[in-house]
Amino acid sequence: MERYEIPKEIGEIMFGLLSPDYIRQMSVAKIVTPDTYDEDGYPIDGGLMDTRLGVIDPGLVCKTCGGRIGECPGHFGHIELAKPVIHIGFAKTIYKILKAVCPHCGRVAISETKRKEILEKMEKLERDGGNKWEVCEEVYKEASKVTICPHCGEIKYDIKFEKPTTYYRIDGNEEKTLTPSDVREILEKIPDEDCILLGLNPEVARPEWMVLTVLPVPPVTVRPSITLETGERSEDDLTHKLVDIIRINNRLEENIEGGAPNLIIEDLWNLLQYHVNTYFDNEAPGIPPAKHRSGRPLKTLAQRLKGKEGRFRYNLAGKRVNFSSRTVISPDPCLSINEVGVPEVVAKELTVPEKVTKYNIERIRQLLRNGSEKHPGVNYVIRKMIGRDGTEQEYKVKITESNKDFWAENIREGDIVERHLMDGDIVLYNRQPSLHRMSIMAHRVRVLPYRTFRHNLCVCVDGDTTVLLDGKLIKIKDLEDKWKDVKVLTSDDLNPKLTSLSKYWKLNADEYGKKIYKIKTELGREIIATEDHPFYTTNGRKRCGELKVGDEVIIYPNDFPMFEDDNRVIVDEEKIKKVINNIGGTYKNKIINELKDRKLIPLTYNDQKASILARIVGHVMGDGSLIINNKNSRVVFRGDIEDLKTIKEDLKELGYDGEEIKLHEGETEITDYNGKKRIIKGKGYSFEVRKKSLCILLKALGCVGGDKTKKMYGIPNWIKTAPKYIKKEFLSAYFGSELTTPKIRNHGTSFKELSFKIAKIEEIFDEDRFIKDIKEMLKEFGIELKVRVEEGNLRKDGYKTKVYVASIYNHKEFFGRIGYTYANKKETLARYAYEYLLTKEKYLKDRNIKKLENNTKFITFDKFIKEKCLKNGFVKEKIVSIEETKVDYVYDITTISETHNFIANGFLTGNCPPYNADFDGDEMNLHVPQSEEARAEAEALMLVEKHILSPRFGGPIIGAIHDFISGAYLLTSNYFTKDEATLILRSGGIKDELWEPDKVENGVPLYSGKKIFSKALPKGLNLRYKAKICRKCDVCKKEECEYDAYVVIKDGELIKGVIDKNGYGAEAGLILHTIVKEFGPEAGRKFLDSATKMAIRAVMLRGFTTGIDDEDLPEEALKEIEKVLDEAEEKVKEIIEKYERGELELLPGLNLEESREAYISNVLREARDKAGAIAERYLGLDNHAVIMAVTGARGNILNLTQMAACLGQQSVRGKRIFRGYRGRVLPHFEKGDLGARSHGFVRSSYKKGLSPTEFFFHAMGGREGLVDQAVRTAQSGYMQRRLINALQDLKTEFDGTVRDSRGIMIQFKYGEDGIDPMLADRGKAVNIDRIIDKVKMKYNQ
């Protein structure tokens, strides 16, 4: 009778600790000797290679299971330790347990009432599927504070932990070392029922098991030895470490038995602890690593598990598979985008299993006759036969020269042959790192000679645009030197959040080659942007060129202050020392080092942290508290939960973590001025930061400690003299906690006064400066503050208070320019209110101009919110005008956040190839599916043509690049002879007959390149758009364009215009996008295959070369450039002379040196731009390099001007280069030389060549970008691995829901709307405009 394995489903996994008894039970041998092999080379009994632990040598048999090498899985042994040792992996856990339990009775030091309450919580969490560990953390926290045991009444002394494994008992001022035996003794006392409170299951994890008395010895198969060429054996690192442990353990045992002095025993015990520590983790902090004699650190247990080379990432997450190949890649334009060229040598090695049937038997016979050496052939034949035991078995036979003919004659139906890879087979093609699904796609094989894999190759705003940072605005052109250090406000589904930037562009608008539009909304809000710059509207993302009057764009209304460059120091080391001395504090150096490590001293206004600290100070002077003394300094923050989370994020930026947010409920009795008493009930949330360094810093920044009602103080001087945006941060945070919420009056169209109160005791009331300072500061924002005085309360300490009641009446100015921070609900209302008041102001102005009837009622605020407001402060405004305009430069930024948007002039706007491979030595992987199911799945889901459109935005991610684009431009802008036209058409796989010539020149019939290209287009395609070569004329002439830049396609025929990147380039290709959307992916693939091959043939016929002479400039151009650069250097000399004489005019907020640098940088930047403009003027459109730039094939005009004219100033961290030798950067310059050339100005061009000093400066500037890129790559890679681990089991079910592997619902509809982004139209489910255009073109409108 046959036996079948019963499949089992894993219900749960329980992790535990190995008990000493269990270690002994699973052990097959007690290991007692450090020796491994005897003189004859056989394993020693009781040694680390004992054959009871398994065998690794051929010929030996395992004494435990009788298996040989490959059969025996290996067995554990054990070492009896002479003294207990701490398991380093549990050192911190042991410390937490020791602090939580009573050393006398072993009970957890919490009362019975609290114990019952916690057990009930745990039962509830277990029942509801919650996280019990948070409750356990609460137990540890509560119990560690107790000093008298509530169970036995004994004193519970404190425990000190010193890494890696040392514990001390604190008894008064004395410290007594706890040995591992002492620790184990305490842990043994803990009853089972208390283990549950500590998060341990006593059945599988008793706490004393964390202190080792028996050490398991892993099987020999886990740590095999190797035989070197010399014949000597080399042991595994784990064996080396175990030898050290046994040797020291034996010595310790002998000394204990021999009655050696305690000092020697302690030394040997510590040494045993060290060897056990490094056996578990040889990279633990505070322990010198164990090393080989060669100096190489040993690779022990922890190192085998963690990191890139560890078990998890290397062996589990990263698989090594059969039927795969890897080699260098190279391009082949003759292949289809669905094809991959495979070297013949690879095709002969990789095989595809194919079953023999009556339909393919003759073909397989021929393959068998070819054998395994000739392609296409067969490597193996598999035949099922009845074995001697009567069961069906598979026999695999290798095909050789001697047996190939035999098998060709005797092959039969039902056999399986493993044949060579052949043309048309489906394979998977992958490039690492595999960051998105297009990193591995299915291709069809084309077997080719040679040894490489081959495959087909196949946005901005005006400089004065303001970008919203965290509560301040900055012009985008001013970000050029600061973009790496700032964070911009971005929107994640209309949830504002801050993000850093990954890129910044400044481009010459003419070189960028896009139309530029000025957009104006109904409230007069304006922005200038290029036609491709994306805007967020109520109908999804639209490019600027697609916007129409009446479209509603998304706005974040504000009138926040502008960023001002100010390098003044706010607080430094001396100021911190003074504060520490004033309070009689200790640990001065420790506090200063903490602040330096967090880069909080010295602190300047320009530092991002200055804005955060202004907010923190504002909150602490409002609802917060600062308690500062030698023993228990802390800062308390109060507010709603969401607002406290925002404060926590800010604190994290400063390097501090707050404690848990707690709910406080209670009531208090208040006595008013007349003696009348009232009971006030309330609740609120708060959290604390118990870090003395933060408390000292806030004190140095002017925060008031203790009871603010009894103290006289004003706004800190650093805030009063700060740039306006810092003042705004302070005020908005203070008002976030103190000012009333915006409320509308009963008639619904005007707001109630905004007010706040400040109470002071009578004795200091008239002398307090705080309210006066606020009044003065608000005047700078155009806001008037009215103050009145009211009687206060009678305090419990006997003091009477008076109250300032301050009211704000300039609502529009307050909402627009200041608003609320750390008060999200108030801030959202403030944004809506600001937009509402602007709308009302416009309405009143229009009414006066147009003399509307006075009885026309203005919309109420509530109705305005419903009609105009979105969420979190975002609103919508209608576009009232769109005009073409011109600017010199355009700019763009890219956010690190996946949101890829930012707020420009109040508008919510977006940031301006699948394998991402180049051919400079990149390698790729190829995998051969081994079953029909796998091949069908790859063909249906993974074929390249199915991935032309990006799953990110629905546009084409695959498209033409480089020569394909240049070729398409040459093809569609020229005429060709009959032979040439025929050759181009045949290259594209088009077999149509030639039409009548389009024109005759000198008796030679010529055929239009436009008509040739049209043969690749599907019938029924109708499209109009502007090519990339468009000159951005003031008035578009459309079909009459003299530059042939307006493309018109009717019924699949190119009537007007040339084809460039905008036609079929990657991401931008409108033709390709339209074909895939309207005719399907296969039509898109056919078009791309045909059009690219014809383009390449056109390049070959016409000739298209670029070289160093393309950057040649005439002598007059070079003289003009030299003159500009000479004048710039003279200006720099004048600036330096003025600086040295002390006559240089200071720039606002800058000292003398900073002003000098700002003037010099400005002069040199202008010089580079002027030199570029001269070069551009002399490079014409007949230049091949220029053609590549304007068609979008490669690079841009800016690259060409740098090659031909001048590189300009090289910078490090946004400034001229100053780091180098003392007094000078390089020894080639005089000490103290401040000139342009001595600090990184490169006046040469790439064409001319750089001098040695210029080359060095250029390398310094380039290195910064390389380091920055490397750091960001590592961070994004780590983030992606974590996301993959978290989300790997999510899938979309057939009912449209998203669920995890347990069937738990994550989303009711994929993406909440059920739309596949790949099938959307650049973010929109349906493109209405495209449908209208199609109808118009169909009926010739």
Swiss-Prot record:
Chain sites annotated for binding Zn(2+) 2: C102, C105, C149, C152
Cofactor(s) of this protein: Mg(2+); Zn(2+)
Source organism superkingdom: Archaea
EC number: 2.7.7.6
GO cellular component: cytoplasm; DNA-directed RNA polymerase complex
EC top class named in words: transferase
Complex formation: Part of the RNA polymerase complex.
Primary role: DNA-dependent RNA polymerase (RNAP) catalyzes the transcription of DNA into RNA using the four ribonucleoside triphosphates as substrates. Forms the clamp head domain.
Name used for this protein in its record: DNA-directed RNA polymerase subunit Rpo1N
Protein's organism: Methanocaldococcus jannaschii (strain ATCC 43067 / DSM 2661 / JAL-1 / JCM 10045 / NBRC 100440) (Methanococcus jannaschii)
